[in-house]
Amino acid sequence: EAHGAHFIYHEAFPESAANSGADIVIQSLHKTLPAFTQTGLLHLCTDCVTREMMQKKLSIFQSSSPSYVLIASIEQCIHICNENRGYFQQYYEKLWILREKLEELKYIKLVPTDDIGKLVFSVKDTTISGEELFEILRDNYHLEMEMSELYYVIAMTSVCDTQEGYDRLYQALKEIDSEITKKNTEYLFLENDFHQNKKMLKPEEAATKDRIQIDYDDAKDEIAAEFIFLYPPGIPLVVPGEVIDKYVIDKIRQYEQYNMKVIGLDDHKIYIINR
């Protein structure tokens, strides 16, 4: 529940997994609450896992020298939120006013979400992509969004956001909306269609082989030396040790056509096993 640490502070937010039957819930405080980056909480909600067992497992991965600055930030965050629940009512009211104004945009559409604090903007059927909207907001308006993909941009809000920040976001989107138009779009579907690549090596075996970099157009029937994927959603097109077939090459070309960032692609080149 990375983006759900704030759920318990107002009834307008979704029910927290911690109150919905989950055994263990991990929340990132820094994503939606006033806490330093890297701070989070692990909740044991049932007796499925004992505290002793959890401490034993965590000791394998956790540092023996924790940051007391981050620990203090967590404690301060919890104190502020518990003692000032009225802030969340103000947050809720400002969000609804902002959402009502955003609904008036002509081309950029505000997509309904369960969490009103998550603003999802659709640019389907418009003359810009989600990636382009993301870059315009960053470069021209100094507004940092959470993420983007071909047709969408997500803005994460928090109880710490100011009215000035909401006004800047609305004015920026209003200006951009006035400069774009509607267009007929041939949609690129990104759903996983369960294409099965031929496996020649295990990933750990591929990692030990010599590799070379070639143009992906010339990589048909070669063996991949690195993961190639689009993020989001992060599902690999090909895994190290798998054969690169026509499907993979066509998908990479399709993603490039829409100016989407393909991880594992470097200036039209990819790494393959040197055979």
Language model segments and positions:
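Conserved PLP-enzyme active-site core in the AAT-like
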Residues: E1-K109
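Short C-terminal domain-edge/linker segments immediately following a structured domain
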Residues: A2, H30, K56-S59, L150-V153, ...
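Short amphipathic alpha-helical patches
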Residues: C81, C160-E164, R275
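Charge-dense polyanion-binding interfaces
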Residues: K261-R275
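Surface-exposed loop/turn and secondary-structure junction residues enriched for glycine/proline
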Residues: I8-E11, F36, K57, F61-S64, ...
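Conserved C-terminal alpha-helix-loop-beta "cap" of PLP-dependent enzymes
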Residues: E103-L265
